[in-house]
Every structure is written in C-alpha cells, then in structure tokens.
C-alpha cells in the first residue's frame, strides 16, 4: 500500500516535497507542519520564506481529513485555479497600459470596461497583483450588457480586491454593481458603507426585501482587502479576505435587462453614483455561486 508525506511551509529556495512511503494495509497521508521560532504554522497554500522544518508530522487516512485551507487546491471540490474559470462572466486584472481608456476582460467573453470620468494617464496604478484601477471617487468603468452578463439569473459571485482611501462622501463606495431596472430594489452590488464596513446587496423586486449581509467590522484604510459575495439561489453570503462574514436568506431571479455592469460605482436609479474612493484590482463576476473553498482560493491572489 502507498502512503503520502506532504511537507508545507518550505523555505523560499526549497521545493514542495511529495514522497511515497511504504505502509501497511491502508493508504495514509502525513502532513508535515513547519515551525519558526518555536511556533506552529497551520498547513497553508501560501508558504512563508524563512520557516524551517522541525520534524513534526500529522497523519491522515485520506485527503477528506485535510485541514480546509490545505484541501482548497483539491480538484474534487473545484477549488483549483483552473476551476475558478468555470462560470466566469468577467475578469478584470486592470493591468492595462497607461493611457488606455479600456480595461480588458480576461474571461474570454469580451466584456471589456470603458473608463468614464477618469483620466487614462492617471487611472492605472500599482495594484494587489501588477496593476490596478484608481477610481479615487472620480469616475468608474462601464461594461456594456451582453449575453454572458445576462446569463446571471439564479446565482452569482462578485469579487474584488479593494484599497480604501478612507473617505466615502455618500452612502456607499462601490466595487462592482449592476442595476437591473430603474428601481433601487433590483440589482446586485459589492460595496463599503461610509465607515468602511463591507456589505453585499442582492435584490429582486420591491415585493421581496433585499438581502444585505454586512461584515461585523470595518476594513483597514490604505490596505488591500479581498471582498466577495455569493448568491446561490437561497442565500446571499459576504466574504472578507476569504472568510464568511455574514449571510441573509433570499430567493429570486435576476430579470433580463440592458443596463451595464459598473466597476467602481453604483448604477443607482438610472445614474451612476457612489464611486469607490481608492483602488480596485482583480474584479471577477460569475454566473454561479463559488464554494467557500473557491472563495478562499480566490482570496489567495493566485493567477487564473
């Protein structure tokens, strides 16, 4: 029979070691945790240069017993970089050239975003990964309606890295939104309240109260934070840095419409307002609800 030894938290110059070892009648996996200055680092995908091996190991009978963050690259639940492309409607890296008036969509669906009210010589700045869009509360990027955007009906995921400058003069600073009708009840958006508290809005009609899960704490100013929101057909869930921060039950279907998706603003009652005061990076939009493991992987800033 075969067993598996997995060593994580290797020094930067070392390689991840996966060795096959002889065992008796049942497959086992040994997960070796590394230590630094005598402290335990739980198994993780991100690595930490400078850690050293102290010879401590944990054995698992199979991969279903792995700690959650170690299993998040297990293809059985779809939480792989390649799996993150399933159901992708739009992906904006904001790695566009200085002077460009367009943010290219990397999903393959052609949902490029056009800058509105932003100086293209100033809008492109350093980001969480490579470049970012600096809306700075002055404008936004608009994505025209398309068949792929209209495929968002019974489920969705919104995600973005946000760098909050600290001043929101109106109700929200919005990372991504789509108002589906002229009323305020039918749209989705991922935003910060004026005090910097993350919130997700999922609404279908005036007759169905909107779901507004809100985090229990504000985000740090001038610091990159990953926000994500999912709607799976019955529950709206907000995530902050890959961790669920609140949820609300709601059931409905997003109606078809021709209005755009807005990056860095809120299409509120027909006008785009509530611009985001800071930088945005790696905005992703899906026509399905990502799993908690997929959200956690998305928040590790892996390329996909």
Protein language model regions, located:
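Short, aromatic/His-centered strand-loop micro-motif at the edge of beta-sheets
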Residues: 201-226, 270
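Bacterial signal peptide processing site
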Residues: 25-27
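Extracellular glycan-recognition modules
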Residues: 85, 89, 98-103, 138-201, ...
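Flexible glycan-contacting loops in extracellular carbohydrate-active proteins
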Residues: 248-279
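C-terminal motif of bacterial Sec signal peptides marking the signal peptidase cleavage site
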Residues: 21-23
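Localized edge beta-strand/strand-to-loop motifs within extracellular or lumenal beta-rich domains
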Residues: 223-237
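Extracytoplasmic low-complexity segments
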Residues: 31-33, 50, 58, 62-65, ...
């Amino acid at each position: 029979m075969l067993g598996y030894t997995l060593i994580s938290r290797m020094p930067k110059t070392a390689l991840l070691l996966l060795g096959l070892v002889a065992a008796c009648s049942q497959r086992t996996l040994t997960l070796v945790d590394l230590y630094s200055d005598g402290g335990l680092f739980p198994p993780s995908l991100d690595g930490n240069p400078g850690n050293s091996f102290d010879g401590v190991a944990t054995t698992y009978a199979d991969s279903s017993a792995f700690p959650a963050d170690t299993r998040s690259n297990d293809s059985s639940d779809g939480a792989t970089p390649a799996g993150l492309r399933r159901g992708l409607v739009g992906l904006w890296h904001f790695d566009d050239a200085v002077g460009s008036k367009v943010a290219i969509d990397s999903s393959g669906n052609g949902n490029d975003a056009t800058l509105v009210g932003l100086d293209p010589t100033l809008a492109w700045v350093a980001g969480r990964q490579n470049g970012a869009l600096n809306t700075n509360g002055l404008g936004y990027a608009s994505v025209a309606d398309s068949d792929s955007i209209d495929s968002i009906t019974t489920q969705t995921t919104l995600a973005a890295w946000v760098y909050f400058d600290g001043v929101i003069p109106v109700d929200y600073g919005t990372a991504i939104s789509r108002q589906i009708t002229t009323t305020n009840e039918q749209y989705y958006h991922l935003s910060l309240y004026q005090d910097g508290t993350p919130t997700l809005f999922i609404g279908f009609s005036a007759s169905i109260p909107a779901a507004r899960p809100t985090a229990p704490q504000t985000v740090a100013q001038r610091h990159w934070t990953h926000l994500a929101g999912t709607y799976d057909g019955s529950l709206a869930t907000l995530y902050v840095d890959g961790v669920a921060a609140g949820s609300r039950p709601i059931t409905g279907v997003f109606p078809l419409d021709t209005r755009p998706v807005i990056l860095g603003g809120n299409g509120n009652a027909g006008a785009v307002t509530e611009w985001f005061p800071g930088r945005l990076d790696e905005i992703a939009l899906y026509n399905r609800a990502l799993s908690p493991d997929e959200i956690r992987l998305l928040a590790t800033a892996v390329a996909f």
